[in-house]
């Protein structure tokens, strides 16, 4: 059941959860020094005054701290989650109770999800956003696809390829029936988007290469203080949290197959090994495969690993990396989950439509599929993000890194004029984000002397590494 206020001020699961949410937000603020320092730094300046920000990013306690930071800096904000299972209902309630429009609840249908995304793109007096905080690119996609449809209405006749596409097109049909130039007007006022995750960044670069990108974008994901912290250290803790909350399984002694060894895969593989699992990695990239092997992981193909694994984790950002055929070949009681952004890494639709499997829901976000052979598998979070679907996502401290980058990116886009392209935050800001988090960990930095800095050919105060340095 959802609760709706007049004029669509919010739609959340239960507004009475707001007090609980507020208590957890206050705890999270103590663990998010970067965001709180950014609030203090810009308190008198209000650098986002006049900005209308659409946020499509997991509606968690940590995100609530980001939202209130953007509001503190002067922005008008509307928010929805970027995943049907990732909302923490008490966090959404707290934000709604604070008077910030939010449209999010845990367990949305796909139709509800795209309805929520539409709501956050509709401000008062018919206006749209002029900035977007995106995670996975769905808010950006809705504008771009709507824009294409206005140029070629025949696209509305397209037969949807899947249930998600069907839900998205239904919303776009309704918008087009109300205003045939809605998305052109929205795009004309957009100053830019800052994108949180690898999948969304891929979408942006693809649009840029095709000449379809309508406004500037900042790739927050590839800031060092995001990708090397959130993706790596965040997953290192939250993957195990999701698996254990969902299944209570003992990880020690199990065989865990991690598909992909990018930053997310690295965090997952090291996490599972720390728990005592034997970890097998699959990879397409020879560099990542060599890294995994040099770290002591067995690297092989899914075809070779499928009969060995007790737990399978997809981390690739690609589609169909675990197929229906793979799942049919898995050991009895294997656990299958995904920590990449979208659910198409695992062939969930094919599994659900397969007549040779019987589905039994064990509890929310845990489903057992029994095949004709008698073997069963457990699918977590319906193939969506296991750490957010079955747990509460990354810890506050590491999200402070990511969200400080997001805040700085929004300030950059709002206060400066960027041409249409995909950018990264400058190295100085990356280092500043890191610096803001050192004090809480008791870190003391060594300071270069002028002579040492001159010897290295860098400023005393940094930046200390060239842009091509990989960390």
Curated annotation (Swiss-Prot):
PROSITE patterns, alphabetized: ADOHCYASE_1, ADOHCYASE_2
State the similarity comment.
Answer: Belongs to the adenosylhomocysteinase family.
State the name under which the record lists this protein.
Adenosylhomocysteinase
| Annotated residues for binding of substrate | 60, 135, 196, 226, 230
Enumerate the Gene Ontology biological process terms.
L-homocysteine biosynthetic process; one-carbon metabolic process; S-adenosylmethionine cycle
Enumerate the residues binding NAD(+): 197-199, 231, 260-265, 283, 318, 339-341, 387
Q: Which reaction does it catalyse?
A: S-adenosyl-L-homocysteine + H2O = L-homocysteine + adenosine
Look up keyword Hydrolase and say if it applies. Answer: yes
Function in brief: May play a key role in the regulation of the intracellular concentration of adenosylhomocysteine.
Q: Where in the cell is it found?
A: Cytoplasm
Which Pfam families does this chain map to? AdoHcyase, AdoHcyase_NAD
Cystine residue pairs: none
Superkingdom in the source lineage = Bacteria
User: Which cofactors are required for activity?
Assistant: NAD(+)
Q: Which organism is it from?
A: Chlorobium limicola (strain DSM 245 / NBRC 103803 / 6330)
One GO cellular component assignment for this chain's record is:
cytosol
* InterPro entries, alphabetized: Adenosylhomocyst_ase-like_sf (IPR042172), Adenosylhomocysteinase-like (IPR000043), Ado_hCys_hydrolase_NAD-bd (IPR015878), NAD(P)-bd_dom_sf (IPR036291), S-Ado-L-homoCys_hydrolase_CS (IPR020082)
Q: Sorted alphabetically, which PANTHER family does this protein's record hold?
A: ADENOSYLHOMOCYSTEINASE (PTHR23420:SF0)
Query: NCBIfam families annotated for this entry?
Result: ahcY, PRK05476.2-3
Q: Kindly state what the record says about how the cofactor is bound.
A: Binds 1 NAD(+) per subunit.
UniProt-recorded Gene Ontology molecular function terms: adenosylhomocysteinase activity
UniProt keywords, alphabetically: Cytoplasm, Hydrolase, NAD, One-carbon metabolism
Predominant localisation class? cytoplasm
Q: Look up the EC number in the record and give it.
A: 3.13.2.1
